[in-house]
Structures are given as C-alpha cells and as structure tokens.
C-alpha cells in the first residue's frame, strides 16, 4: 500500500476539525483537494474512514481508530525531527582532530585554547601522529578532520590551505653560514645535514628543493621527532632545514636560523573526507583552526625574519 505523509496529515486534520473546509483552511488546501486526498486514502486502505453529511464529517469506527493512532505517530515523528534538528545545531560533544608533531606542538595549542573560549561544551581531542597516520585516520573516519602538510593530489579528500610558510636553515652560531643574511641552497653542497625522516610531510619538499638546486645531499642523521633537530645541530653533528612553525629556538641555545634562497614554502592544509558532512561541532572547530592559521600568517607580516 502506498500512502503519503501528506495524506495522513490531511486525514488527521479532517478528523480533528470534522470539516473539509476548516481542515483545508488550516493546512492551506482547497476543500476539493482535502476531499480528494481523503478519498485516495480510503481507496488505499479499502476501508471507509468518514461519513459525509451536508453539515459535518463523522468518523467511522475504522476512521476513529486510525485517527487516534495516526495522531500519536505524527506527534512522535514531529518530536523526532525536532530532536534531530537540535542535535544538528548542537555545539557540544567530542571532536577528534589529527595533526603531525610540529603542527601539534606549535599551532594546535592555540586552536584548543580558542575552541575552549568559543565553545566550552566541545571537547577538542588531539591525535598527535606522523602525517601518513593522519591521512589514513581521516580516510578511515577515525578522526573528524586533520591538519597536514600539502599532500598533493588526493581525489578522496577535501583540502583547504590555511597557512603558507618558508623553510629556514638551522645552524650553530659558530658556523660560517651564521654570518650570512641569506643562505643560497648551493651553500649546502657537501654540508652535513640532519633532517627529519619520511614520517614528516616536509621531507619530500626538502628533498625536491635540494634536487632542484643540484645539491648532492650529505645526510648524516635522519630523526623522527622535530625537537631532536635542535640538540643535534647544537652538538655540531650537522646543519638542518626546518619549517617556520618549528620556531622559536630553544631558549639559551647556541643556534641561529637563516632564510634560504630561493624561497621554498610549504602549505598547511585542513583535510577531511570528501562528500562527508562534518558535525556542527566539528565544523566549528574547523573554522577555529582556519582562523588561527590566518592569525599566525598575519602576525608574521611585520617580522623581519620573514622578509626577503
């Protein structure tokens, strides 16, 4: 049997008003349209639901039973839809966000603090992992969204750039390179390099920049955690290349950073599954992360370190 929700609502309204004309006025239909709708419902059920007189509409026993049950069902349906609407607008609950270590250490704390200020009922849950794990966790739906270094073409994901930043040379203050205002990539030829391994989203960009400038990389150490770069370089093991987000330098360290020319930048991106809606709470935190990325970019505009 094929009933429409509209037919059921029309019938219940007629049962309540005991009049086709009053029911039509209440729901915005003509009297003939109301009568036709009820007649179709009777045809579908095979049961007479109303007795029509010149002055009023009288429910049959079957019509009375159907009207009572439909009223309860329609009330429950309306209540369910209202609850669903409130749930969709709710700015509370748990939002799972994944980011690589440098991003987690130097951007996400501000994001969490701002989310607590704006949305105290949303729990910002951070998963601090290597980039490849972040990408897979987004694809598998284990997190709501992530922040990564530009992953390149990814047809199954939706990406939004929130921050562009340069790479710097990290060296000991006693290094010959420390006296330069800007260091050309060619100056790294033959130098001992301490770099992050391929768990970092920045490593492919650094490799590409070295190759593009004809540098035969002399990599003496590859490390997993970005904070390890600082003591390695401070100990004289080599020099390094690191993104702006890894700054500032540890307090009291014998290290300096220099701009490398020509400039090579990386992009930080918000990433989510394509064609999948975020919850209202997750959308709110997505906006918070975007805003913090934009604020960080704006705060660097007057810093001489970022001027070439």
Swiss-Prot record:
Give any Gene Ontology cellular component.
cytosol
Q: Which CDD domains match?
A: PBP2_LTTR_like_4
Where does the signal peptide begin and end? none
Fetch the InterPro entries from UniProt.
HTH-type_LysR_regulators (IPR050950), LysR_subst-bd (IPR005119), Tscrpt_reg_HTH_LysR (IPR000847), WH-like_DNA-bd_sf (IPR036388), WH_DNA-bd_sf (IPR036390)
DNA-binding region, residues = 20-39
| Residue span(s) of domain HTH lysR-type | 1-60
GO biological process terms, alphabetically, are: regulation of DNA-templated transcription
Q: Which UniProt keywords apply?
A: DNA-binding, Transcription, Transcription regulation
Say if the entry is tagged with keyword Transcription regulation: yes
According to the UniProt entry, its GO molecular function terms are: DNA-binding transcription factor activity; sequence-specific DNA binding
Family (UniProt): Belongs to the LysR transcriptional regulatory family.
The protein depicted here goes by the name: Uncharacterized HTH-type transcriptional regulator YfeR
Origin organism is Escherichia coli (strain K12)
Q: Its encoding gene is what?
A: yfeR
């Amino acid at each position: 049997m094929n009933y429409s929700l509209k037919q059921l609502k029309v019938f219940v309204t007629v049962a309540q008003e005991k009049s086709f004309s009053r029911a039509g006025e209440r729901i915005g239909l003509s009297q003939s349209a109301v009568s036709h709708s009820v007649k179709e419902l009777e045809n579908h059920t095979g049961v007479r639901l109303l007795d029509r007189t010149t002055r009023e509409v009288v429910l049959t026993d079957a019509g009375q039973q159907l009207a009572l049950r439909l009223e309860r069902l329609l009330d429950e349906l309306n209540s369910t839809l209202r609850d669903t609407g409130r749930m969709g607008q709710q700015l509370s609950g748990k939002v799972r966000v994944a980011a690589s270590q440098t991003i987690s250490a130097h951007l996400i704390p501000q994001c969490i603090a701002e989310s607590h200020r704006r949305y105290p009922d949303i729990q910002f849950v951070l998963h601090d992992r290597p980039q490849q794990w972040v990408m897979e966790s987004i694809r598998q739906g284990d997190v709501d969204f992530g922040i990564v270094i530009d992953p390149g073409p990814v047809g199954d994901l939706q990406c939004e750039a929130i921050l562009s930043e340069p790479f710097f040379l990290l060296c000991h203050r006693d290094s010959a390179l420390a006296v330069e205002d800007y260091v050309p990539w060619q100056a790294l030829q033959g130098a001992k390099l301490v770099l992050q391994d391929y768990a970092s989203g920045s490593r492919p960009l650094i490799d590409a920049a070295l190759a593009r400038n004809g540098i035969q990389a002399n990599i003496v150490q590859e490390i997993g955690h970005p904070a390890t770069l600082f003591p390695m370089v401070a100990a004289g093991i080599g020099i390094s290349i690191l993104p702006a987000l890894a700054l500032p330098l540890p307090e009291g360290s014998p290290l300096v950073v220099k701009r490398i020319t020509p400039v090579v930048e990386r992009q930080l991106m918000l990433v989510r599954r394509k064609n999948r809606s975020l919850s209202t709470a997750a959308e709110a935190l997505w906006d918070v992360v975007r805003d913090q990325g934009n604020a960080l970019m704006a705060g660097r505009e007057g810093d001489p370190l970022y001027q070439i």
